[in-house]
Amino acid sequence: MLTFPRIDPVAITLGPLQFRWYGLMYLFGFLSGWWLGRRRAAQPGSRWTGEMVDDMVTYVILGVVLGGRIGYILFYDLAYYLGNPTQIFSIWNGGMSFHGGLLGVVFAMWLLGRRNGLGFMDVSDFVAPLIPPGLFFGRIGNFINGELWGKHTTLPWGMVFPDGGPFPRHPSQLYECALEGVILFLALWVFSSRKRPTGHVSGLFALLYGVFRFTVEFVREPDVQLGYLAFGWLTMGQVLCLPLIMLGLWLLRPGGDKGTKAA
């Protein structure tokens, strides 16, 4: 059994200003996406420029923050925020939805494509490999906040969390770091290093993320305000992953888009 390493959620204090680890993790995620995007844009045959990557990051930041927060409110705890509307803006305390953020990013990519004369799937295939590092840092932020822990476990790496009771739990945030952050990034980076049919990089992202998240949800404690939605095991996270898995399979289907290009 491991004990949760109590970490002050405030990383840096400068006078009246406080910089929380949770917010810094988002900053690290955006910076890593920008750096990787610049590398991809510099590859031979790329239709992207450094300036387009800079614009892309700006669009994505707005999509992630607005979509992630709105998605969490709508999907996970609408009643609470209707009763406490001032808490809607307290994103430094946590409460972001990946699926809401993804919808925000989809809208941002559509706007970016229109502005630069690129097809939506062209933008999506370029952006997909840049997302996993952000997921990695986001889950580290969840871990530092001591939130989104897993179910009780007797495994030797089970961890006692401050607000999780006296029994060890799965450190499900770290599972997601490994699967959605490290493994997903490596798979997409290698896969996109060669020319692929349009939509295949996006399809692989949707499929693998959906499968990884769906799987981890089995050991992750469901949100207390929602519990299980069906069958005594189906969570909101799993429900939201099912369309992603189906979309990924459809984009990767044999005989799909034949337009082969460098992603």
Curated annotation (Swiss-Prot):
Known InterPro entries for this protein? Lgt
Q: Could you tell me which cysteines form disulfide bridges?
A: none
Q: What is this protein called?
A: Phosphatidylglycerol--prolipoprotein diacylglyceryl transferase
**Pathway entry:** Protein modification; lipoprotein biosynthesis (diacylglyceryl transfer)
Q: Where in the cell is it found?
A: Cell inner membrane
Q: What is its main location?
A: membrane
Function comment: Catalyzes the transfer of the diacylglyceryl group from phosphatidylglycerol to the sulfhydryl group of the N-terminal cysteine of a prolipoprotein, the first step in the formation of mature lipoproteins.
**What species does this protein belong to?**
Nitratidesulfovibrio vulgaris (strain ATCC 29579 / DSM 644 / CCUG 34227 / NCIMB 8303 / VKM B-1760 / Hildenborough) (Desulfovibrio vulgaris)
- What EC designation does it have? 2.5.1.145
- Transmembrane spans: 10-30, 56-76, 91-111, 117-137, 171-191, 199-219, 231-251
Topology term for the membrane? Multi-pass membrane protein
Q: Name one GO molecular function term.
A: phosphatidylglycerol-prolipoprotein diacylglyceryl transferase activity
Which PROSITE patterns would you find in this protein's record? LGT
GO cellular component terms, semicolon-separated: plasma membrane
Name the residues that bind a 1,2-diacyl-sn-glycero-3-phospho-(1'-sn-glycerol): R139
Q: Which family does the entry's similarity section mention?
A: Belongs to the Lgt family.
- Broad enzyme group: transferase
